[in-house]
A protein has these predicted regions:
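N-terminal post-signal-peptidase region of extra-cytosolic proteins
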Residues: 54-70
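Acidic-basic catalytic patches of nuclease active cores, encompassing PD-(D/E)XK
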Residues: 21-59
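Catalytic cores of nucleic-acid endonucleases
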Residues: 65-67, 86-144
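Bacterial N-terminal signal peptides that target proteins for export
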Residues: 1-9
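Active-site beta-strand-loop-beta-strand hairpin of nuclease catalytic cores
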Residues: 69-84
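Non-catalytic C-terminal interaction segments of nucleic acid-processing enzymes
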Residues: 27-31, 49, 76, 133-166
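C-terminal motif of bacterial Sec signal peptides marking the signal peptidase cleavage site
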Residues: 16-19
């Protein structure tokens, strides 16, 4: 009888341990990029936080290709600015602009104007994604995406001031 009890106890122990294994792997929540209109608001606010005044957007010409680039927000008193690159923009511009940076890489800059002295930071929409409470858990919030965008704008403004860009 003792042997039977030990065997049954071991069986119960192993069965319960197997039941406590990791749960099913779940797919990541679907995400979407920050809307361009909202991104421009965030960019304008970030410029203000750096003590500068946001200026109206404008069209510029990329050096070497002659393709037009839309600067979504300029900085008053300076020629540099910020372009929020949507998937559609990236498709239209193709090889005229550098490929999207990964989150751990430096921001991409484009040279514009006749001599290429003017710098425009390219902020790719796909780098600012959120999950909008879809799925089981909220992993990437809108607030987080907006903070990352704001940080990138502020980093560029600091870089532009340090380098004394036009």
């Amino acid at each position: 009888m003792g042997r039977f009890v030990k065997s049954a106890a071991l069986f119960v122990l192993f069965a319960s341990a197997a039941a406590c294994g990791p749960g099913e792997a779940r797919a990541p929540n679907p995400t979407r990029p920050l809307d361009e209109r909202r991104a421009i608001e965030v960019i304008r606010k970030a410029i203000s936080l750096e003590g500068e005044k946001p200026a109206a957007g404008r069209e510029v010409t990329l050096v070497g290709t002659g393709k037009p680039l839309r600067v979504d927000v300029g900085v008053e008193g300076h020629e540099y600015g910020i372009a929020y690159i949507t998937a559609e923009d990236a498709s239209k511009l193709g090889d005229a602009i550098p490929p999207k940076n990964n989150p751990d890489e430096k921001l991409r800059l484009a040279r514009v104007g006749e001599t290429g002295e003017i710098r425009i930071v390219l902020l790719y929409q796909d780098n600012y994604r959120y999950d909008d409470l879809i799925g089981e858990g909220h992993e990437q919030t809108t607030i987080t995406a907006e903070r990352v965008l704001s940080r990138d704008v502020q980093d560029f403004i600091t870089h532009a001031k340090t380098r004394k860009l036009k």
